[in-house]
């Protein structure tokens, strides 16, 4: 489904099911080309107040790309998000957010983001960032070193 169609459907108040793309939300969400490909159920943002830990969908100001990243903070004008597999986050104007994930399809079943198991995962994930961050930075440096050593 094309980016403009996803946004159009959600802004029209319709929910959609979509395969995720990219690696920024691993290990929760896997790319459509990965053996563990993940589908998500997106709902319009119409009457939902986003909470810390939710996964909104927004459009990047710089290139129009659609992004799913976890909400880590907010204020009156902005949402602050970060991918689960990312070190840094982004500041997103509220008007750029138009939907959010309510269900995740993996291993042959749907998992609601309201379920106790998912909420426990979010709690652990959010509070473990300061432990995971140095490990992610180390992994990035090792990947750069490996690419340099093999000449890519």
Where do the PLM segments sit?
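Extended hydrophobic leader/signal-anchor segments used for secretion and membrane insertion
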Residues: 1-152
